[in-house]
Curated annotation (Swiss-Prot):
Superkingdom assignment: Bacteria
Full protein name: Putative gluconeogenesis factor
Keyword Cytoplasm annotated: yes
Family named by the database record: Belongs to the gluconeogenesis factor family.
Kinase among keywords: no
Function of the molecule: Required for morphogenesis under gluconeogenic growth conditions.
Gene of this entry: yjiF
PANTHER family: GLUCONEOGENESIS FACTOR-RELATED, UNCHARACTERIZED PROTEIN YVCK-RELATED
Species of provenance: Lactococcus lactis subsp. lactis (strain IL1403)
Location relative to the cell: Cytoplasm
């Protein structure tokens, strides 16, 4: 019997935690990673070199590799603010940019680097071109650029993408749709709802594949609400927004953390984008027609509240070995 095929879709700092745990399991693992980041080092590189932003891809490469910690630390090394043009760039971002330019494609660069770093699984950027994220707010205002969305401080109605260079509709990378169609289980998140997960899903080919796939679709619900994105959101609100963007109720299962976050770990000075713990609304979740798995998925570290990758991975593997939740 072949290993279950698990596809994880997202970006940011959320999915690397889960991918690092999943790569140790007996599964066929694939990561599909957002390329809509336009802030910080990634934003500067995509403007200078005209490639898909490397930051989220760098974190996923490291999470899925068996490289020693010292090698990972080298890739994560961020140049000091006194280092002129290099200031703020992680070395790994510059390496991805260089290989992307050499090979004329971020997709090809990631495949090369995945071999080089002994990645266990497959990594695909959701698109091979840099994308611009558009957020349309409830008041009709529209904000362009992932890094600018939270600062508007309005209620987001929906998001969509365009290719940064041409303004055209985005196109999925090679093998992305195939991976979704052949998957046994698809995992969305964890991560920022509007700026890490949805920038993959609203690529038309990916959205259509999520409609058509026979895979079980699992959403790992965020533990904390996020400033400028999901303020006052319940767990059901997160699921509802995902289903609305896809166009139908495709989420089969949601993983919900029920462990309380201690007050002292809601550190808005250190983690200023996170606000309070996500409220539970089990009646509304029932209306979204999802199977709810409630458990302690909480890990307290670095002064903040995060997902415990091992606990999440355990549930994902268990779901992948069952058939009853296939939609």
């Amino acid at each position: 019997m072949s290993n279950p095929k698990v596809v994880v879709i997202g970006g940011g700092t959320g999915i690397p935690v889960v991918l690092k745990a999943l790569r140790k399991e007996k599964i066929d693992l694939t990561a599909i990673v957002t390329v809509a980041d336009d802030g910080g080092s990634s934003g500067r590189i995509r403007s200078a070199v005209n490639i898909a932003p490397p930051g989220d891809l760098r974190n996923v490469l490291i999470a899925m590799s068996d490289m020693p910690k010292f090698y990972a630390d080298i890739l994560q090394y961020r140049f000091d603010k006194s280092d002129g043009e290099l200031a703020g760039h992680p070395l790994g971002n510059l390496i991805i940019a260089a290989v992307s330019e050499m090979q004329g494609s971020t997709y090809r660069a990631i495949q090369t680097l995945a071999q080089f770093f002994h990645v266990e699984g497959k990594i695909y950027p959701s698109s091979d071109a840099a994308l611009t994220l558009h957020a349309v707010f409830k008041d009709g205002h529209e904000v362009l650029g992932e890094s600018h969305i939270a600062s508007y401080k309005g209620l987001i109605d929906h998001v969509y993408l365009t290719q940064t260079a041409s303004g055209d509709s985005p196109v999925a990378s090679k093998n992305v749709v195939k991976s979704i169609m052949e998957a046994d289980t698809i995992v969305l998140g964890p991560g920022s709802l509007f700026t890490s997960i949805l920038p993959n899903i609203v690529i038309p080919e990916i959205c259509e594949a999520l409609w058509k796939t026979s895979a079980k679709i699992v959403y790992v619900c965020n533990i904390m609400t996020q400033r400028g994105e999901t303020e006052h959101f319940s767990d059901a609100d997160h699921v509802r927004v995902l289903n609305e963007h896809i166009g139908t109720k495709v989420i089969d299962t949601v993983l919900v953390n029920i462990q309380e976050v201690p007050e002292e770990y809601m550190n808005t000075n250190k983690f200023d984008e996170y606000l309070v713990q996500v409220d539970h609304d089990f009646e509304a979740l029932k209306a979204e027609e999802v199977n709810v798995i409630s458990n302690n998925f909480l890990e307290l570290r670095d002064g903040g509240a995060f997902h415990n990758g091992e606990a999440v991975a355990k549930e994902i593997v268990a779901i992948s070995q069952r058939q009853e939740f296939r939609h």
